[in-house]
């Protein structure tokens, strides 16, 4: 990512830079907190003891590489505001790729590179789909079907994939639009109050399972539209609200 273009508002790949990324050197954590006095990483592998992050850019970018961190571990950012009377708050990662199931709210390190898609045929034909009629089936994943074997009634992304694809194909649809799947605090909502913008809600599984759902749709000739609402964010204190103390 070009950091200069990011601050100009022109970087569309910020998720590849910010967040927690698994590398050969360990996990690299980066977050943006321009008005913070200090940012610490706290994570389960370090017994949740604060580790200072380094401010690497005048715009407020903080970074830390943890060699022993691995995918699947939980973490948060502990942000100290400049105001001495302000509260020191532990926040989830706005760019994280995974979060705990509510009411817990730690971010989870995910390695998205380990999934291999099998949708080359769909991708090769995708450009031609704009010339064809579009019939979109909008669905709220959590209420579309009830799983009698789950205490919350939810199917995982992986479990619901064949059921949903079969229904959509029989009904004559060629696209599925998923109502927001980003992490959100309330079960009763449609998902429009985000806490983890790049974290698929853990109600239905992991990012890899969501990737498998999309892959299954594509292999069946079904396009996927994700309802992504970055302008709606929850006011919960652990999320983006007052993230750097302002």
Regions found by a protein language model. Name each.
Residues 52:
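N-terminal cofactor/phosphate-binding cores enriched in small/glycine residues
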